[in-house]
């Protein structure tokens, strides 16, 4: 229903194109199996994070293998080119030109500590300072869906631990992700 509402809007935004893009990303993201990162979840750390309201990743960063991460990005990029809805030659050429080797190991390490900061740094490393908005949207989809591979199990485990806590309150307190701290 919400999508139908957006499609009817006349605000100059290509909502149909954005919906098609998002759907094509969903179609290809499952080409990457969810990673079972060794030792990525610790119940004691989770309980400490929840109790102290500190993001889990602050206490125990997720260890991501940089070479594997770059391969995952390339695999998803290739699948997106093959199956995605981007079909304008200039945009396909830009997508093919992305070089994941520009991502430093330190930046990939940052993905396991602070995914929001990682996105900002990674975008600049891969696209440079003069990145156009279309490519920023494309790279966001690629980066976020590869991160999903690494964070999905951890996020589910944290949600399970959070469900055990009986501190339900209502009010105007800001919500943050218990795993990474991003605003919810």
Please provide the spans of the model-predicted regions.
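N-terminal alpha-helical interaction blocks
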Residues: 5-162
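Cys/His-rich short segments
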Residues: 160-184
């Amino acid at each position: 229903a919400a999508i139908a509402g957006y499609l009817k809007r006349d605000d100059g935004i290509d909502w149909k194109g954005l919906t098609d893009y998002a759907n094509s990303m969903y179609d290809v993201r499952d080409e990457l199996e969810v990673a079972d990162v060794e030792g990525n979840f610790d119940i004691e750390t989770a309980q400490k994070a929840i109790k102290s309201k500190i993001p889990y990743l602050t206490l125990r960063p997720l260890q991501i293998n940089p070479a594997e991460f770059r391969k995952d990005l390339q695999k998803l990029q290739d699948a997106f080119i093959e199956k995605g809805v981007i079909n304008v030659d200039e945009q396909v050429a830009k997508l093919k030109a992305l070089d994941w080797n520009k991502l430093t190991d330190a930046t990939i390490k940052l993905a396991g500590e602070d995914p929001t900061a990682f996105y900002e740094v990674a975008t600049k490393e891969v696209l440079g300072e003069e990145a156009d908005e279309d490519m920023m949207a494309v790279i966001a989809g690629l980066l976020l869906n590869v991160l999903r591979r690494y964070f999905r199990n951890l996020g589910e485990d944290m949600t399970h631990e959070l469900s055990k806590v009986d501190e339900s309150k209502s009010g105007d307190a800001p919500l943050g992700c218990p795993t990474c701290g991003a605003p919810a």
